[in-house]
Amino acid sequence: MIFPRKKPAPVTAPWWQAQTRAKSSKGSVALIAVLAGAAGGILGVNASGASIFNRVNLVSSTSTIQRAPDSVAGTAQRVLPSVVSIQTRSLTGGGTGSGFFIDSDGYILTNNHVISSAAQTGGRIQVKLNDGRIFTAKVVGRDASYDLAVLKIAASGLKALQFGDSDQVAVGDSVIAIGSPLGLSGTVTTGIISAKNRPVTAGDSSNESSFINALQTDAAINPGNSGGPLVDSTGSVIGVNSAIA
């Protein structure tokens, strides 16, 4: 008895290997998508070399994102113009920190340890605003026991931050820290109040250190954040970032 010879199954390459033109069937089509704006097309070439074009309509959205004023983004947008970056140069080296305007005439609150070396040795203190302008600042006053200092720049019409009541802050309240960690100005981090009345020693040297009862937060704070504001959900200042764990 003679059985008909079975036709061997065609051997196909795995999907990840390119097919040669000789092995491509006439019905196969290579497609390249071309998308532009709200309308576009699909351009391709079939096995015979003829071009094909199928038009497609794409829907684009022109709506803008509406953010609540008390959202993190909304609060940061209001606070950022009032926050500055601080760079110091002194005989012992340089440093960076943050600060914020406490009135419209150029008065800035920061940490004493940010500018203490420059203040002691007659060094230079430069302040960079959120809009990119740079000013030389002078020290109006400083208090090592509270790790606070006030600077002044020759500018006016500036946006100052409002102060809140840190005594009314509760553990678990949301907070936002803004400053220039690692020299990265305009950095925003969020967290909560983790604890109150934490005993903290702040400062760079033993003769100008301070022992304060501080608010503890889990918001990311790094070198360069010192002197920047810690604000509540309304954008009011409830603390000054002075130390990191």
Per-region residue spans from a language model:
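Serine-dependent protease modules
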Residues: 2-5, 22-245
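N-terminal targeting leaders characterized by basic, low-complexity, disordered sequences
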Residues: 1-18
